[in-house]
Curated annotation (Swiss-Prot):
Belongs to the peptidase M74 family. GO terms for cellular component: outer membrane-bounded periplasmic space. It comes from Escherichia coli O17:K52:H18 (strain UMN026 / ExPEC). Binds 2 Zn(2+) ions per subunit. Zn(2+) ion 1 is bound in the active site. Zn(2+) ion 2 is bound at the dimer interface by residues from both subunits. This is Penicillin-insensitive murein endopeptidase. Residues 1-19 form the signal peptide. Zn(2+) 1 binds at H110, H113, D120, H211.
Length: 274
């Protein structure tokens, strides 16, 4: 499938959830032992943790949207990564969307982030902590050139390279989505230590943030993991294909309705949403 068709599918997956979803009516995590259920784009979570808003190592953006819930493994990953970044004096980690209290489908902006195992992290590491006003209305820093073929040299910093590499080296991380131009720059900067690049995957948009995804927890028996990324650093023909013009004759895919929920997620909705 060519890149234009994939882009249209991604857009449809996101726009299909623009209408309000019942998951928004669940305002607190569902009690129980932590269980990620279903797939990243069609699932839910029981026993989600709340990411502490106050931390000396990170700051949480858009707290008014209450998207700072996730599996305990995700909370621990954020704390672990931000502590590493702080110890290296790289700056403050800026945390974007995680998931809703019970996971589930958003009303827009995300097709995934449904099982408590995804988090968006800004590709900025401010040395001075942001104000409350800045956090509520964050200004994204677009690192990619207008033509989408490379990063903006004056905006690309070694600290951002280190942030992405640290995240990719974490044992619980399976994928990190970034813009193809950012992946390309990582490939150029990586040197001989390249194993971690396998986890960094080019994807549409993602010009100012990285989307980090964790593996399914071992005790979440209903969680559906993705296949591992292809072997290698992903810096060859696959990456270059993202910069090729779309093939002629690309047709817009039919709009698809969301798939049925996993039975456990449907039961959760039936119990907690009137």
């Amino acid at each position: 499938m060519n890149k234009t068709a994939i882009a249209l599918l991604a857009l449809l997956a996101s726009s299909a959830s623009l209408a309000a979803t019942p998951w928004q009516k669940i305002t607190q995590p569902v009690p129980g032992s932590a269980q990620s259920i279903g797939s990243f784009s069609n699932g839910c979570i029981v026993g989600a943790d709340t990411l502490p808003i106050q931390s000396e190592h990170y700051q949480v953006m858009r707290t008014d949207q209450r998207r700072y819930f996730g599996h305990p493994d995700l909370v621990m990953f954020i704390q672990r990564l931000s502590s590493q970044v702080s110890n290296l004096s790289l700056g403050t980690v800026l945390i974007g969307d995680m998931g809703m209290p019970a996971g589930g489908r958003f009303n827009g902006g995300h097709a995934s982030h449904q099982t408590g195992l995804d988090v968006d992290i800004f590709l900025q590491l401010p040395k001075t902590r942001w104000t409350s006003a800045q956090l509520l209305r964050p200004q994204a820093l677009d690192l990619v050139s207008r033509d989408g073929k490379h990063v903006v040299p004056t905006l690309w910093k070694p600290e951002i390279f280190s942030l992405i590499k640290l995240a990719a080296q974490d044992k619980d991380v399976t994928r990190i989505f970034v813009n193809p131009a950012i992946k390309q720059q990582l490939c150029l900067d990586a040197g001989t230590d390249r194993d971690w690049l396998r986890k960094v995957r080019p994807w549409f948009q993602h010009r100012a943030h990285m989307h980090v995804r964790l593996r399914c927890p071992a005790d979440s028996l209903e969680c559906e993991d993705q296949p591992l990324p292809p072997p290698g650093d992903g810096c060859g023909a696959e990456l270059q294909s993202w910069f090729e013009p779309p093939k002629p004759g690309t047709t817009k895919p039919e709009k698809k309705t969301p798939p049925p929920l996993p039975p456990s997620c449907q039961a959760l909705l039936d119990e907690h949403v009137i």
